[in-house]
Curated annotation (Swiss-Prot):
GN (gene name): CYP71A27
Record-linked CDD domains: CYP71-like (cd11072)
Annotated source species: Arabidopsis thaliana
Name this polypeptide is given: Cytochrome P450 71A27
Pfam families registered for this protein in UniProt: p450
GO (cellular component) term, any one: membrane
Subcellular location: Membrane
Keywords: Heme, Iron, Membrane, Metal-binding, Monooxygenase, Oxidoreductase, Transmembrane, Transmembrane helix
Membrane topology annotation: Single-pass membrane protein
Length: 499
């Protein structure tokens, strides 16, 4: 009897062990995943990205749908190209999607992502962001630097006047980059730092650093191939550049500490003043301060310059829009001097021109998110840790939203399309939306409008000297995840005699 019981128990145990995986397979509901294109072993769908990922992802979405699942190596990637799902991510489930994926560049330049742009959502991140939004980039602070912006734009227009008087060409791309960098330097550090001023070329240092954020690293997606990044030398190169940038910014902070200004005159002074305030609950050290400064340079230099560069490109391609804008500017700025910010505030068509440039050429065409927990989107199961890419470039060229002429440059459309920058609007997201909305919108727009108004009022523009022909700049894009011109915008300015 005892042997029978032992045999029965063993049989039951073996049956249970054998049937458990089978029962689990039967009873467990298989997750419902979005459509996916066929992928290769090891690399997944990486081979399908191409030189301009926003365009290639858009092409794939036309075939597989506005919600599709790709695999970049071992990493699952959800690509979103429709406004309703974008709204779910940035509004309905904004808290679940408040994080951003990390990368090797973020780990090196931003200490693993402890800054405002890439930091994980939480109390520390909210406190650090408030330093930028409440103390540094609020409307009052942006307006306080009005004279500074007008001074630097005067420097730019004087250079253009010199080129005009000698019929010389100008690298407008480089000039706009210098403008934005010099303004950010003065606002952040207290003065300009460039080769012309006899100092370090901070512009080149920032631009070289920024380029790494758009590069592909094997280790980010295929850990077993991380050694390729190491032997290529890119790791050491990033660390070397980051060390130079950190040393420079640290020396700037120390210079301000030694000066001990009683009245703050720039961002470093303000941050040091906040740091001394014992009533503040959030405490930050020197490394946190340097990360905030990096955020200011990385997010403010190239993006604003690129916006202006593309807008000038489109205006030169559409002389009727250039003329309409010139007429509006001259109707409010009736003197022969530079346009002021107070005059710019009255110009509605100028606002439309800026918005149309951002719609067609967003400097950040792909918005990245990382869900902190499992979530359902349109009936599909999305696992925590899935990388999410919102194709803002595709959203802002969607014919269902913008009409059949969605790919055409037409600033007038913004007179009746009431899509704002500050709202969580999933159809127009050049600065992102939700908790990850870019805090520097006000700074960028004020500078873009003022610079563009002066470029258009003071000068006429040609690609070449001679008879007017097919004198239009191209729209070729550089390779990478940012939408930048492939070739610099080389132009011939001439004084516009309008009064």
């Amino acid at each position: 009897m005892e042997m029978i019981l032992i045999s029965l128990c063993l049989t039951t145990l073996l049956a249970f062990l054998f049937l458990k995986p089978l029962l689990k397979r039967i009873t467990t509901t298989k997750p419902k995943l979005p459509p996916s294109p066929w992928r290769l072993p090891v690399i997944g769908n990486l081979h399908q990205l191409g030189p301009n990922p926003h365009r290639y992802l858009h092409s794939l979405s036309l075939r597989y749908g506005p919600l599709m699942l790709l695999h970049f190596g071992r990493v699952p990637v959800l690509v979103v190209s429709c406004p309703d799902v974008t709204n779910d991510i940035m509004k309905t489930h904004d808290l679940k999607f408040a994080n951003r994926p990390k990368s090797k560049a973020i780990n090196i330049f931003m200490e693993g992502g402890r800054d405002i742009i890439f930091g994980p959502y939480g109390e520390d991140w909210k406190s650090m962001k408030s330093l930028g939004v409440v103390h540094l980039l609020n409307n009052k602070m942006v307006r306080s630097f009005e004279n500074l912006r007008e001074e630097e734009i005067k420097v730019m227009t004087e250079k253009l006047e010199e080129a005009s008087s000698s019929s010389s060409s100008v690298n407008l791309s480089k000039l706009l980059m210098t403008l934005t960098n010099d303004i950010i330097c003065r606002i952040t550090l207290g003065r300009k730092y460039n080769e012309e001023e006899g100092g370090i070329d901070i512009k080149n240092l920032v631009m070289t650093s920024s380029e790494f954020f758009g590069k592909f690293f094997f280790g980010d997606f295929i850990p077993s191939l991380a050694w390729i990044d190491w032997i290529s030398g890119i790791d050491d190169k990033m660390k070397d550049i980051n060390n130079k940038l950190d040393c420079f910014l640290d020396s700037m902070v120390q210079e301000h500490v030694d000066a001990d200004h009683k009245e703050p005159s720039d961002f470093i002074d303000m941050l040091l003043l906040i740091q001394k305030d014992k009533t503040k609950r959030f405490k930050f050290d020197r490394s946190d301060l340097i990360l905030i400064l990096k955020d200011m340079f990385f997010s403010g230099t190239a993006t604003t310059a690129s916006q202006l560069e593309w807008t000038m490109t489109e205006l030169m391609r559409h002389p009727e829009c250039m003329k309409k804008l010139q007429d509006e500017i001259n109707s409010f700025s009736t003197h022969n001097l530079n346009v002021t910010e107070k005059e710019v505030e009255k110009m509605n068509y100028l606002h439309c021109v800026i918005k149309e440039g951002l719609r067609l050429h967003p400097s950040g065409p792909l918005l990245f998110r990382l869900p902190s927990e499992d979530v359902q989107l349109k009936g599909y199961d999305i696992s925590a840790g899935t990388h999410v890419i919102i194709n803002a470039w595709a959203l802002q060229r969607n014919p269902a939203i913008w009409g059949l002429d969605a790919n055409e440059y037409r600033p007038e459309r913004h007179f009746w399309y009431e899509f704002g920058f500050q709202r969580t609007d999933s159809k127009f997201v050049p600065f992102g939306a939700g908790r990850r909305l870019c805090p520097g919108i006000g700074f960028s727009l004020v500078l873009s409008k003022l610079a563009l108004a002066n470029l258009v009022k003071r000068f006429n523009w040609r690609l070449k000297v001679g008879p007017v022909g097919d004198d239009k700049p191209d729209l070729a894009e550089a390779s990478g995840i940012d939408v930048c011109r492939k070739f610099p915008l080389i132009v011939f300015p001439s004084i516009a005699h309008t009064h």
